[in-house]
Amino acid sequence: MYDFFPFYINIQKKYFLIVGGGKIACRRLKTLLKFDVNVVLIAPDISPEIKLIQNERLRLYEQAFEEKFLDKINYLILATDDKDLHKAVSELARKKGISVNDASCKENCDFYFPSIIDKDELLISVTSLGNNHKLTHRIANIIRKYINKFTTQTRSL
């Protein structure tokens, strides 16, 4: 039996806080900015790739986490290599009713970040519930290839 139910929710205009400034934070950020959400990203060291992202819905703070950053946040994404920080911040967030995604600990997740396939009017997500990221990405790539092939064939009819 599963603990997590796969459903789509309206996140329009919601606020996400990403704690972390590296590769995983960058991937999460790029995914989120495909949707109509606001993102605050905070980290003492933000990667050059993230700094290059220009978006009016993004606020970057190159500093250590402070509890005040949880104000008005709906969802928290923890993407650092500091497990103690993740534990402390997730506890603060949950006390405020904020859902948590911890990129380094699936047991500390209230929601998962799936691989997303979007093509025309299709939006498909694939997840292994944090168990096998490589398999998830492989399956998502197979689906992408199939959808590209299928939509090309359908248009030629």
How would you name each of these model-derived features?
Residues 23-24, 84, 130:
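Residue-level detector of alpha-helix initiation sites
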